[in-house]
């Protein structure tokens, strides 16, 4: 099915190179989601994935996909003329998240564990579950890298220079956060993080919001979406496109 994208683009007259690349990107992403067998069910799943994107991005992708679906129908590649529709809730305007001023996170705290948890999420985009699984053996301060293992997936992320001094005192342990050589639970991490953000005057900040702040800062620094996805351990950039 993927080879049909090239055939489709060949029939599009007058498209610029950038426009063709945009079509190709959107359609490859579409096929990644729906697979080789296009059906009402697979299209609904894809459409649901678009819900978090900006309306302009949704309209662009839906337009490209509908043109491609019509092309497939004309060529006899699919037995029905499928068509995607813009979800009604997409018409509601949502506020774009803003970068928060969180310099106070670097100041001393009565909740040092919560502070370090917050900084690891904010500065590296790590999930609490990933942080709790970190072993000291996974950290190399000399090369400023951290190895993250999650299920069958592994990735290497860079440790910001500012965090090196925060990690150094913990290098004699087994886990980064531990008690008696065993990692703490997620409930413990939640309580520590909650206490810390309350102390700093941000009671509504969650791990998810802090991870979003990492994404916003990366985009502010002109980091490519694919690179951000790689840092976060995401397989696609679909969930990041709403931040464009």
Swiss-Prot record:
PROSITE patterns: CB, TYR_RECOMBINASE. Residues 90-244 form the Tyr recombinase domain. One of its GO terms (cellular component) is cytoplasm. Coiled coil: none annotated. Keywords: Cytoplasm, DNA integration, DNA recombination, DNA-binding. It holds the Pfam family Phage_integrase. The keyword DNA-binding applies. Disulfide bonds: none annotated. One of its GO terms (biological process) is DNA transposition. The active site is at residues 150, 211, 243. Residues 1-73 form the Core-binding (CB) domain. It comes from the Bacteria. One of its GO terms (molecular function) is DNA binding. It is found in: Cytoplasm. Belongs to the 'phage' integrase family. XerD-like subfamily. Putative tyrosine recombinase. Not involved in the cutting and rejoining of the recombining DNA molecules on dif(SL) site. This is Tyrosine recombinase XerD-like.
């Amino acid at each position: 099915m993927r080879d049909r994208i090239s055939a489709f683009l060949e029939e599009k007259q007058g498209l610029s190179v950038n426009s063709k690349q945009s079509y190709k990107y959107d359609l490859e992403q579409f096929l990644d989601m729906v697979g080789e067998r296009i059906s009402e069910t697979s299209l609904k799943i894809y459409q649901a994935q678009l819900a978090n994107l900006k309306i302009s991005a949704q309209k662009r992708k839906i337009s490209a996909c509908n043109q491609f679906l019509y092309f497939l129908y004309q060529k006899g590649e699919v037995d029905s003329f499928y068509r995607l529709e813009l979800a009604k809730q997409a018409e509601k305007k949502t506020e774009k998240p803003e970068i928060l001023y969180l310099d106070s996170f670097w100041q001393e705290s009565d909740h040092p564990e919560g502070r370090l948890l917050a900084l690891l999420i904010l500065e590296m985009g790590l999930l609490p579950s990933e942080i709790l699984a970190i072993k000291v053996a996974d950290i190399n301060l000399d090369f400023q890298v951290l190895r993250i293992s999650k299920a069958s997936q592994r990735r290497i992320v860079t440790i910001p220079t500012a965090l090196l001094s925060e990690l150094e005192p913990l290098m004699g342990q087994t886990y980064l956060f531990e008690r008696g050589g065993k990692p703490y639970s997620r409930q413990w991490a939640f309580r520590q993080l909650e206490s810390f953000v309350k102390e700093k005057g941000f009671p509504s900040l969650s791990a998810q919001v802090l991870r979003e702040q990492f994404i916003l800062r990366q985009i502010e620094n002109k980091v490519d979406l694919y690179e951000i996805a790689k840092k976060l351990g995401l397989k696609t950039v679909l969930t990041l496109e709403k931040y464009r």
